[in-house]
UniProtKB/Swiss-Prot annotation:
It catalyses: L-lysyl-[protein] + 3 S-adenosyl-L-methionine = N(6),N(6),N(6)-trimethyl-L-lysyl-[protein] + 3 S-adenosyl-L-homocysteine + 3 H(+). It is found in: Cytoplasm. Methylates ribosomal protein L11. GO terms for molecular function: protein-lysine N-methyltransferase activity. Belongs to the methyltransferase superfamily. PrmA family. The keyword Nucleotide-binding does not apply. It comes from Rhizobium leguminosarum bv. trifolii (strain WSM2304). Its EC number is 2.1.1.-. S-adenosyl-L-methionine binds at residues 136, 159, 181, 228. The gene is prmA. One of its GO terms (cellular component) is cytoplasm. The lineage of its organism: Bacteria, Pseudomonadati, Pseudomonadota, Alphaproteobacteria, Hyphomicrobiales. This is Ribosomal protein L11 methyltransferase. Its main location: cytoplasm.
Amino acid sequence: MSEIRLYVTTTESKAEEILDLLSAVFGEEDFAIGTTEIDEKEDIWEASIYMMAEDEAEVHSRVEDALKASFPNARLEREVIPDVDWVVKSLEGLKPVRAGRFLVHGSHDRDKVRPGDIAIEIDAGQAFGTGHHGTTAGCLEAIDAVVRSRPVRNALDLGTGSGVLAIAVRKLKNIPVLATDIDPIATRVAAENVRRNGIASGIVTRTAPGFHSTAFSEHGPFDLIIANILARPLIRMAPKLATHLAPGGSVILSGILATQRWKVIAAYSGARLRHVRTIWRNGWVTIHFDRP
């Protein structure tokens, strides 16, 4: 069944207001809600809510009612998102990736695992994160370093995608991990990958559209938070993210172009975190902070 996106095109400030409105209307219901920048120069943004086709009629009606009350001039638009399993045909071209002690590989490369490898099996699919992108590999390297160097008892993988980073933490250390994403398809894919890697009992996967989700208060605070998203949302969420970090905890951030690193470092320094290390990979950076 196809997924449906309902969205409003507007400015950044109004998109954030609509995001807050929809989050209040739908609360803990299993619908992904988010904002996306379309054109930075022209200040064009979209506020979106995602649902399966069977839920569209009810969700559409509730969204329209909410918008009429607060944003009477907003135009609600619709997009059908095809249920496509991408890159599967190119699996043979995806080679295993090494990062720290980890080897991320597809099911077709199980024979490449060597003694001593911490193997994570992830096939290309509908969610980001097979280890081939510099941001994922940088996060894996940082996770390995953090878990080696300090106690970690409770972890959060924010924007989990394929679940590869949550799986990495759990395979390194027998601790609880919360893996969240705004996209229910990504959450489902992550749960499937967790089961594939034989560690389903240690990782909780949740669809959570923002920090107002009760998932974070139920499972936190966390002494390791990993967020491989994009620089702009990482900068915006710095104050809220920091409130979920336990004393002495670590934060690993990626999805950041090298040219954007100073803005991210400034935002998290402003949230009273200390910049520890920056890992560079193919024009992208992964940044490690801790709470002194």
